[in-house]
Regions:
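Conserved N-terminal alpha-helix of the aminotransferase class I/II PLP-enzyme fold
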Residues: 1-44, 66-74
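Conserved PLP-enzyme active-site core in the AAT-like
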Residues: 32-258
Length: 258
């Protein structure tokens, strides 16, 4: 069912989301996109997709506060260690990398100071150690810069901001650059390069090829959390009559029940 893209289940995708995902992926020069409930969800899902207990992430020291807290508190409480560093200082970046480092995470322009990340240089260090570079391009937008062209492997956005244009809807997007070889170190990136027992033993790097990263999030993580995200978005997006009576009733009952 993963070899051919399609609307296989409501919590995973629908026709409207598919158009949005394809367009953002095309703008970024990626092979596939995935729309989620918020920018925070995009950051969380991207890191959870490859990080687990005993793993390590190197993160830039100029991150949006929510992303910083996710890494230093939430993921840390789940057994993921971290090093916060000025990623533009390549010696410090190199020194921060450990054998169990599975991602380098940075922003094109730091939020809120807009200091610029040297993506080309950071990507070169990351790839020399066979580590994917995840870039939050919310402030950059593909109109100004396409991080994949500079070496980023995964690009994420809070679509609530510049992509949405008005801050009137919540949303996030994950774009798969399709260039990182997850099978080069199958033990390290086992969630993508080894059989997944929670999804019929599928090896996502095989069945989804270049789109393995976003496909696993869609198939596994959204399988577990997608209904909550879709429901929250329905409740929040009241524009243009989107609050149909059934949704209004469901939202009210949810909030009344706590």
């Amino acid at each position: 069912g993963l070899r051919d893209a399609g609307n296989i289940y409501g919590r995973l995708t629908n026709s409207t989301q598919d158009v949005f995902e394809r367009r953002v992926a095309a703008l970024e020069g990626g092979v596939a996109g995935l729309a989620v409930a918020s920018g925070a969800a995009a950051v969380t899902y991207s890191l959870q997709n490859i990080l687990g207990v005993g793993d390590h992430v190197v993160a830039a020291d100029n991150l949006y506060g929510g992303s910083f807290n996710l890494i230093t508190h939430t993921l840390a409480s789940q057994g993921v260690s971290y090093t916060i560093v000025n990623v533009n200082d390549l010696k410090l970046l190199e020194a921060a990398i450990r054998p169990n480092t599975k991602a380098i995470y940075a922003e094109t322009f730091g939020n809120p100071n807009s200091d610029v990340t040297n993506i080309d240089a950071v990507a070169e260090v990351a790839h020399r150690h066979n580590i994917p570079l995840i870039i939050d391009n919310t402030f950059g937008t593909p109109y100004l810069i396409r991080p994949i062209e500079h070496g980023a492997d995964i690009v994420i956005h809070s679509a609530t901001k510049f992509i949405g244009g008005h801050g009137s809807s919540l949303g996030g997007v994950i774009v798969d650059g399709g260039k990182f070889d997850w099978k080069k170190d199958a033990e390290k990136f086992h969630t993508l390069a080894k059989p997944d027992p929670s999804y019929h033993g599928a090896v996502f790097a095989d069945v989804a090829g270049q789109a393995a990263f976003v496909t696993r999030i869609r198939a596994v993580i959204l399988r577990d959390t997608g209904r909550i995200c879709a429901f929250e978005y329905t409740c929040m997006d009241g524009e243009a009559g989107n609050f149909i009576p059934a949704s209004r009733t469901a939202c009210r009952k949810c909030f009344e029940s706590g």
